[in-house]
């Protein structure tokens, strides 16, 4: 990437206490990064494409090592793209395919699921084995198994189930155990990058050629938007849905002593999807000690068209005018190069530590 003159800070950089002390003393080295989380967030991923390109196209390959990539929903799709033989091409292709999607008014859950399956097939293009055998990256896909009414795609029953989830979540996040089981479908060459998971029923499932596509599809299957994935190979019978329902921003007990580098859409870590409107529901500080979070700054966002990153509501906002939405999304992807360029410059000149805020 060629450097862009930075007139205002494009990035907000926040770090947990151990990461902050380490970076301020020794700087940030790619060799120190062992884990990268990827949050759920739909089209917001397009808004940080330039950051992904800088990380996976330039910075991380300069210090090759075994790294865990753990994502929910679009986070898992971003990381699957980065595991393709040409990471930069894969990341750009995901942005192109996502942008080209278009839905008419009244589109059904089945139609959106079918469109997503086609997009996934076009993205992987028969290169599943390359993802599973990537020399440096170990992919972890977050999925939930749904219980009770949430296992049904009938809109009425599913709606009742979601109402029950919302009510239980208000009473306490732990009550979501009644509704969901967490699954991490992971590259069997390396255990998932987390310590013991005691907050919800959780299990690990080996990722392989027989379940890669179903796992990716399930990880992004938002209830009431897409159908759930049935009987995921290796995970047993049942209905499997978006991993972001439980782990929206991956507030997880990360293992090891490496830096957890988190390219994110926002400077907040929100535990679950149902916590988005609950400002008091915050991430656990002890889980963030080794995290370095990179996110678009408020100044950067204010200069984007519509003053924000792309989001799922854009499909409704631009209903009947797909070219305008696509132009907006492409502009946002182009602008996001500033995020990547600023990160590369800060990492290279050793001044990243000066910009760090406490996470």
Predicted region positions:
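Catalytic nucleophile serine of serine hydrolases
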Residues: 73
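Patatin-like phospholipase
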Residues: 1-68, 81-359
């Amino acid at each position: 990437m060629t450097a862009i003159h930075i007139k205002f800070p494009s990035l907000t950089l926040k770090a947990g206490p151990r990461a902050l002390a380490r970076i301020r003393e020794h700087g940030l080295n790619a060799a120190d990064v062992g884990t990268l989380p990827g949050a759920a967030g739909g089209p917001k991923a397009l808004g940080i494409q330039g950051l992904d390109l800088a990380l996976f196209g330039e910075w991380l390959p300069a210090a090759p090592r075994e790294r865990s990539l753990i994502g929910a929903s679009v986070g898992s799709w971003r990381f699957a793209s980065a595991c393709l033989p040409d990471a930069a091409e894969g990341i750009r292709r995901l942005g192109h395919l996502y942008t080209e999607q278009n839905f008419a008014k009244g589109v059904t859950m089945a139609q959106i699921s079918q469109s997503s399956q086609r997009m996934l097939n076009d993205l992987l293009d028969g290169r599943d084995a390359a993802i599973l055998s990537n020399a440096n990256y170990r992919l972890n896909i977050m999925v939930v198994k749904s219980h009770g009414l949430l296992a049904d795609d009938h809109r009425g029953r599913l709606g009742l189930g979601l109402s029950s989830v919302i009510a239980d979540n208000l009473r306490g996040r732990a009550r979501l155990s009644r509704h969901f089981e967490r699954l991490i479908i992971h590259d069997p060459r390396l255990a998932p990058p987390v310590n013991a998971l005691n907050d919800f029923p959780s299990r690990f499932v080996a990722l392989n050629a027989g379940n890669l596509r179903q796992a990716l599809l399930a990880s992004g299957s938002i209830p009431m938007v897409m159908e759930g994935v049935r009987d995921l190979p290796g995970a047993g019978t049942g209905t499997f849905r978006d991993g972001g329902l439980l782990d929206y921003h991956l507030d997880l007990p990360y293992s090891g002593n490496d830096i957890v580098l988190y390219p994110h859409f926002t400077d907040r870590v929100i535990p679950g999807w149902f916590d988005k409107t609950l400002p008091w529901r915050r991430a656990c500080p002890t889980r963030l000690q080794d995290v370095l979070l990179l996110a678009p700054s408020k100044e950067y966002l204010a200069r984007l068209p519509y003053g924000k990153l792309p989001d799922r509501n854009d499909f409704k906002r631009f209903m009947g005018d797909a070219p305008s939405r696509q132009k907006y999304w492409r502009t946002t992807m182009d602008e996001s190069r500033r995020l990547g360029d600023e990160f590369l410059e800060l990492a290279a000149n050793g001044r990243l530590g000066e910009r760090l805020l406490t996470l």
